[in-house]
Amino acid sequence: MSNLSVKDFKIVKLIPKIPDRLKHLAPTTLTSERCTFTIHNCSNAVSNAIRRTIMCELKVAYLHTEYEDIVTDDPFIIPEMIQKRMRMIPLLQNTPPDTKFSLDITNNTLDVLDVKTKSLIRGKPYFDETITILSLQPGKSLKLSARVASEYGYIPHYGMCALAFNATSICKDVTPSNMYDEAAESKSHFSDPRVWEITFNTNGTMPSKQIVTSACSNIIDRLKSVLSLLYTMAHNDNQYVLTIYGDSDTIGNLLIKTIDELYPDVEAATYSASAIERAVTLRVIYGDDINTLYKNAIEHLIETFKSIMEQI
């Protein structure tokens, strides 16, 4: 992958300007970042795979609270909402997995008490202290315990299981086509951008550079797992169908685009993602050794993402 290069890797700290009257709401532990970098000589499938993976396909640590571990005499508190709220608290990803958190509080005032995450912290802070967990009525009490768990962002109802937000992948070497301009030099269908600028924001739970390298490592592992599934391919003459359960458009698009680039004479190569489960199906019409085709495509992609990791 000597022609592939990563350039202009930039990280900007996103420090909010907060009025003095709102200083009590300012972040205390986490610092958000905006990361931008450019990949030269790669396909849109590669840049899009990184974008998709950093947004929702990395496993993310979060605070998990069991329903039974929430005990309160406040009738306005709904345990399910507290569970959801706890999941939404951004948590440092280097938090030891055996870390336990607990909260035991009574509102002895005459006003509604906003309970902040500061009340959860014991020792080293792993999240901001100024996030409101719940509002406790006068004279009421609450106890809860939480532990560190992890989940993927694409799983529904798991709140803050993401490391990057507002991620974009924009081509820099091809002018976007105007569909209404009949005099346009080239239609987007025929363009093949090879320079991609990737930009994303973080919530401060993991350094930007580590997010990118983790995404590349994640994609490499998923590609390697495809090699172990080649024996499951169904075929009819020279038509081959490979279904990858537990994966998404990310891998499907990567493989089909790479097959198309490495084997331009292949008769047909398409993929489709299931609408009801996490699975992607690849269909290829090829007259020679199909295993060699897949192995070459996967090895090429593995080298591509290793090269990106080394240059970050």
Q: Over which residues does each language-model region extend?
A:
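Protein-protein interaction/assembly regions in multi-subunit complexes
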Residues: 1-312
